[in-house]
């Protein structure tokens, strides 16, 4: 996933209403725009604008049946985002493991030498 696509996706998912729309679609399956709007205390036009942002991010698709617009969740972009966050987590896990190893090594050195970098009489300083 390129940076621009990821940015659009994260921006779209960054809004509470859009996350609620996406969650509803995942839980209930594809829905008409009017049925989706019935779940929110806002105008049909406002819900449509949120859906448009989700569409642009690839998080939902729209198909038309006559005059009805049916909206469905698309989970593939979420999987790609999960992979990106997984990569970040791996980097942090490695950094934390290195920090832990460094701290454990210092503790072992202190035990061998009998030092712990603490003054013997803290009040004397």
Would you name each region that the model predicts?
Residues 7, 15-19:
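Short alpha-helical elements of helix-turn-helix
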Residues 14-15, 66:
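Alpha-helical hinge/cap motifs
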Residues 1-5, 24-27, 31-35, 39, ...:
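C-terminal regulatory/oligomerization modules of transcriptional regulators
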Residues 64-70:
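Short, Lys/Arg-rich nucleic-acid/phosphate-binding segment
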